[in-house]
A protein has these predicted regions:
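Short loop->beta-strand "edge-of-pocket" segments that line small-molecule binding or catalytic clefts
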Residues: 22-36, 43, 128-152
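Extracytoplasmic small-molecule ligand-binding "clamshell" domains
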Residues: 20-98
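Periplasmic-binding protein-like
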Residues: 28-31, 107-112, 206-244, 268-272
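Acidic, polar ligand-binding/catalytic clefts
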Residues: 64-138, 216-220
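Ligand-binding cleft/hinge of the Venus flytrap
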Residues: 50-59, 133-174, 203-209
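Sec/Tat signal peptide C-region and signal peptidase I cleavage site
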Residues: 14-20
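Short helices/loops that flank or line small-molecule/ion binding pockets
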Residues: 56, 65, 70-83, 162, ...
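Extended ligand-binding regions for polar small-molecule ligands
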Residues: 47-57, 117-130, 134, 138-139, ...
Length: 280
């Protein structure tokens, strides 16, 4: 009888070990999506959404791995890895090398421009009014700041790369937006391209929020979607299937929707809500 019990116990333990699951998440130092230190540590949008998924999956261990932001796609594309990342842009090329969820993991406003409030007033650009980036850089001759090697969508990328005789200031990607925000506050550049939550977080953390404002662009789509991506192998396929189902669950919660709004300025939150509601 004891032998039977011990055999059963051994089988149970081995089964538990074989069924133990871990999802390895790639995180990177890119506020306000991941905030690794300072006053707002661990209050990043993407890291908080991962925590919501973690609560939904108590039987799966979530392991966070910190890597440079420029290496995320490279690590995901390596089939010898078993890793996932949140809020990725999905295109045909990436889908050849990475599994993506059908459900979006994040929804946000598309790229906008930040500028001095005094400049917005001088140009008579009302709050929340969409402006044309082409008009600002070609007709108004404003100096535009951008981060090097970063995509802002096909239309904006093409506009920047193909418009002749524009005044462009480019900074390397690491901490480039913070550097450009500092330049914007000093009026060394006129306008700065980025995502609304990034503009808001940097202005707030650098104590420039009283000086700076932002406007949506006519060249940007209404919304920007991010998806979970996992390594394109057997384990990645299983992880994607599980995470896709859990996204359906958390996206119905108030906690999730609050996270989408966390790093948006108050005046842009109704705009995001209305645009999300219009897609339902």
């Amino acid at each position: 009888m004891l032998r039977i019990f011990l055999t059963f116990l051994l089988f149970f333990c081995l089964s538990s070990i074989s069924n133990a699951r871990t999802i390895n998440w790639l995180a990177h130092d890119f506020a306000p999506y991941y905030i690794l230190n300072g006053q707002y540590q661990h209050q990043g949008r993407d890291e908080s959404i991962i925590s919501l998924l973690e609560k939904q999956l108590p039987n799966i261990t979530f392991n966070r791995m910190l890597i440079p932001s420029g290496k995320v796609i490279q690590e995901l594309s390596n089939t010898s890895n078993n890793v996932c990342a949140l809020s990725l842009y999905k295109n045909d090329y990436r889908k050849e090398h990475i599994y993506f969820t059908d459900e979006s993991s994040t929804t946000g406003l598309s790229p906008s421009i930040a500028m001095h409030k005094k400049l917005a007033k001088a140009l008579n650009i009302a709050e929340l009014k969409e402006v044309s980036l082409l008009n600002l850089i070609q007709d108004k001759k404003l100096t535009l700041g951008v981060s090097m090697s970063r995509s802002y969508g096909q239309e904006i990328d093409t506009l920047i790369n193909s418009t002749p005789n524009i005044d462009l200031v480019i900074r390397p990607t690491r901490d480039s937006l913070a550097s450009l925000t500092y330049m914007l506050n000093l009026k060394r550049i006129d306008i700065l391209l980025g995502y609304p939550s990034e503009h808001y977080y940097l202005a707030k953390s650098m104590h420039f929020e009283e000086n700076l404002t932002q406007r949506p662009l006519t060249e940007s789509p209404a919304l920007s979607y991010g998806f979970i991506g996992c390594t394109k192998n057997e384990q990645g396929a299983k992880d994607i299937a599980i995470l896709n189902e859990q996204l359906k669950v958390i996206k119905k919660t108030q906690a999730y929707n609050d996270l989408l709004m966390r790093w948006l300025p108050e005046d842009l939150r109704p705009l995001l809500k209305s645009r999300i509601n219009s897609t339902k």
